[in-house]
């Protein structure tokens, strides 16, 4: 996977047309490897045997490319040995422990989980070029032994943008709750599709941190932060964390205090920097290699960084 400095990456994705064109070409490369597979309601669990081969597909948005870090990786290419995002740091750590790792990084900037969130975001002025279900799930490596999924951050931003544009009318809380349910339906489609394509893959999911507690929202109105909190906490507690009952391992970003340390974020206040991605990679590595990884917390202080309405 080819690596780019932060400045070069920003130049490539400076305009929507160039962003779409660059990644459309990458998607065509991925499409040349068609995927078929069987069905599996749940996936395997437990760590890979020491020294074994790990075939890893990372499903995500710009976070999977390491956007905000010092070395950002362009998706779909073969190798990114110096990348400083959580995917790349975790891969190097696995290799240092003797694992042989093959990676397909599906991370696409601006991506949301499904077409419904993509359309909603575009309706309210957000640039969203991709979604996980249509543009990432079909290209999961069928021989994957590990799939990681990190969805929700961009989706929360779609919800708050829609509310800011008048969506929800006199019932904004009802609108948020409806979007949480839609996110859950999309997650079911995404996870089912991944397991159909890659039935031997262990699935590790990173839950959604409370976006209201991230630096990029510090200057926003209380109402907007309350909406972001309701959406993020709902996505995590109602959609992502229950996936543990379907055999997924959950990395609990929501309740990890490191998710809210300002020094772990890049200048945009939303994407982690090298330090932030390093902590994410350390938790991902522990989830991959541990025979017993803790379940996500059902409640914690970070779920209420602002008072609920």
Q: At which residue positions do the language-model features occur?
A:
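N-terminal secretory targeting modules
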Residues: 1-101, 142, 291-309
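Structural recognition of the beta-strand scaffold that forms the well-ordered cores
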Residues: 55-66, 102-107, 145-150, 155-158, ...
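Extracytoplasmic/secreted cell-surface and envelope-processing proteins
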Residues: 66-68, 115-116, 156-161, 213-216, ...
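Active-site segments of SGNH/GDSL-like serine hydrolases
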Residues: 153-154, 163-164, 191-230
């Amino acid at each position: 996977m080819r690596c780019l400095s932060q400045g070069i990456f920003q130049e490539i994705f400076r305009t929507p047309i160039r962003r779409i064109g660059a990644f459309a070409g990458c998607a065509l490369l991925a499409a040349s490897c068609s995927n078929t597979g069987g069905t599996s309601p749940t996936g395997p669990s437990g760590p890979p045997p020491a020294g074994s081969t790990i075939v890893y597909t990372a499903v995500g948005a710009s976070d999977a490319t390491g956007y905000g870090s010092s070395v950002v990786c362009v998706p779909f290419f073969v190798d990114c040995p110096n990348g400083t995002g959580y995917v790349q740091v975790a891969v190097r750590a696995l290799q240092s422990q003797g694992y042989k790792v093959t990676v397909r990084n599906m991370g696409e900037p601006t991506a949301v989980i499904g077409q419904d969130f993509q359309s909603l975001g575009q309706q309210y002025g957000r640039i969203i070029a991709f979604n996980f279900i249509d543009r990432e799930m079909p290209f999961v490596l069928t021989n994957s032994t590990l799939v990681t999924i990190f969805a929700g951050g961009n989706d929360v931003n779609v919800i708050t943008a829609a509310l800011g544009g008048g969506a929800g009318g006199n019932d904004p809380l009802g609108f948020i709750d409806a979007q949480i349910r839609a996110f859950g339906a999309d997650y079911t489609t995404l996870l089912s599709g991944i397991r159909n394509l890659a039935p031997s893959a262990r699935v590790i999911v990173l839950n959604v941190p409370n976006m209201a507690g991230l630096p990029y929202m510090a200057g926003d109105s209380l109402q907007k932060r309350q909406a972001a909190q309701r959406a993020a906490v709902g996505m995590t507690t109602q959609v992502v964390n229950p996936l543990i009952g379907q055999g997924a391992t959950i990395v609990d970003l929501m309740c990890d205090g490191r998710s809210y340390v300002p020094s772990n974020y890049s200048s945009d206040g939303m994407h982690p920097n090298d330090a932030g991605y390093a902590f994410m990679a350390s938790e991902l590595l522990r989830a991959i290699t541990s025979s017993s990884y803790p379940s996500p917390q059902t409640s914690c202080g970070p779920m209420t960084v602002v008072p609920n309405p």
